[in-house]
Structure formats: structure tokens, C-alpha cells
């Protein structure tokens, strides 16, 4: 359960969990409207998509662009994690992320480790081990339904498996750890365990429960914003933060 959110957000969370929000497919089922097609991604002479909650929060093509709302949600979660980790990390840990001001020469893996066009979302380098250990973390915001998170995890693991091997061949330890957060704020036990790895590396003195709950809260708040703007163009927005986090200057 996520606490400390406005009443409207909590109502959204509860109604979305039982699929009783006023989405077009539900409105048609309740005989309130005759058409349940998504008007945001409809194109003439194409098969229309039904505007379900899954479609609105995770699947609408018009919401998937570089400056669109789903990227904003993903990067808001990533931004909160990055700022929190950098603020609390020990000196032997370096944190890079696929965000402005948190890269190393426009890369998330420093070039002295490997030169690659791949940019995992979060890269943590632990220089306390011999050889140093490189952790590749890739975030996916998934709709919570059977099989979704498992499929996303396997897909991202496969994406970075060859890169992991290349880094090992360059003389480093390397771990490939994709993880998923639910678009409605849910976190599975498996993903909580994956976040434990990040937490122990960077912020062992930070309350872990608060850490993962604020990650989930960020996803939920962003999804509520996406739901509220489901019929409107997206004009962009700064990253959403669930709590005040001190900005960290990139060294």
C-alpha cells in the first residue's frame, strides 16, 4: 500500500486495480457511449485500438514518443532513483544514468570500461572489488497483469547479455539486472529483491522501505497524470518527484 498521496490519486489506484475507471471501454460496457476506440492513436484506414486502461497507461502509440508522457513517467522514476542514489552513495561507487547531467560523455557506461552505443538506464561501478564490478540496471514500467513483468525482464536481460559478456572480456566483473515497476504502483517481491541490490550498493543507510515505496509512488502519480490527460495532447513536463531530493552535481 502506498501512503501519502492525494485523495484523488488513492481513488485512482483503487479503481484502476479493479478496472472500474471511466475508460472508453468501460463506458461502452456501461452503455454510456457507443464507441470505445482510442481517438489519440486512431489513423484512417487502420484497425482502431480499444481504449482500455492497459492501452491508455502502457500501449497507446501516440503516448510513446521521445517527448511523450510514457517516456516522462519512465524518466521520472529514473530521475528519483538517480538523485537519491547519488546523494547517499559511498566514495567507491559511481552512478550513471540515461538522463541529462548524469551521463559520462553522453554514455551511461564510461568509455574506459567499454565503448558502446548501448545505454542501460542505470550503471553502477563498484571500485571496491578486484576487478571492479559493473552493474547494468534497466527499468521497465509495466502494466500489472499475468506474465507482463516476466516477459519484460527476459527481453531486457537478453538485450544486454552480449554487452555483459563484452565487459567481462575487458577485465571487469559485470552483472545484468533488469527490473520492473508497475504502472499502477505495484512492485513484485522479485523486483523488490532487485532493488535491494541497488540500495545496498549505494544507500545502505537509507530506509529501504521508503526508497522502494517512493519509486512506486512516482510511477503511480505519473500514471494518474497520464490518465487525466488521456484525451489531450502532451506538452511536456519536468520530472515528477515524490519527495524533495537534493540535486547532485555530476563530477
Placement of each model-derived feature along the sequence:
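Metal-dependent nuclease catalytic cores in nucleic-acid-processing enzymes
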Residues: 85, 156-171
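Conserved, non-catalytic sequence blocks in retroelement Pol enzymes and Pol-derived host proteins
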Residues: 3-6, 26-31, 66-71, 146-152
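Active-site metal-binding core of divalent-cation-utilizing nuclease and nuclease-like domains
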Residues: 28-37, 84-139
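Conserved, well-structured core segments
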Residues: 11-14, 39, 122-125, 135-141, ...
Amino acid at each position: 500500500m502506498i501512503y501519502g498521496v492525494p485523495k484523488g490519486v488513492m481513488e485512482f489506484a483503487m479503481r484502476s486495480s479493479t478496472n472500474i475507471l471511466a475508460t472508453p471501454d468501460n463506458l461502452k460496457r456501461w452503455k454510456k457511449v457507443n464507441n470505445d476506440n482510442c481517438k489519440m492513436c486512431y489513423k484512417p484506414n487502420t484497425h482502431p485500438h480499444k481504449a482500455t486502461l492497459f492501452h491508455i497507461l502502457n500501449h497507446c502509440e501516440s503516448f510513446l514518443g521521445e517527448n511523450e508522457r510514457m517516456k516522462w513517467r519512465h524518466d521520472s522514476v529514473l530521475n528519483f532513483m538517480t538523485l537519491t542514489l547519488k546523494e547517499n552513495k559511498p566514495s567507491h561507487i559511481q552512478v550513471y544514468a540515461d538522463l541529462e547531467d548524469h551521463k559520462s560523455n553522453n554514455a551511461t557506461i564510461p568509455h574506459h570500461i567499454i565503448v558502446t552505443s548501448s545505454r542501460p538506464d542505470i550503471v553502477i561501478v563498484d571500485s571496491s572489488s578486484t576487478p571492479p564490478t559493473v552493474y547494468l540496471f534497466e527499468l521497465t514500467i509495466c502494466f500489472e497483469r499475468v506474465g507482463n513483468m516476466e516477459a519484460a525482464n527476459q527481453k531486457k536481460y537478453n538485450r544486454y547479455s552480449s554487452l555483459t559478456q563484452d565487459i567481462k572480456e575487458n577485465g571487469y566483473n559485470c552483472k545484468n539486472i533488469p527490473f520492473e515497476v508497475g504502472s499502477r504502483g505495484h512492485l513484485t517481491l522479485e523486483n523488490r529483491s532487485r532493488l535491494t541490490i541497488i540500495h545496498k550498493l549505494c544507500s545502505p543507510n537509507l530506509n529501504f522501505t521508503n526508497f522502494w515505496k517512493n519509486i512506486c509512488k512516482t510511477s503511480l502519480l505519473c500514471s494518474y497524470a497520464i490518465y487525466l490527460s488521456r484525451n489531450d495532447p502532451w506538452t511536456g513536463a519536468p520530472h515528477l518527484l515524490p519527495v524533495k531530493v537534493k540535486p547532485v552535481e555530476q563530477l
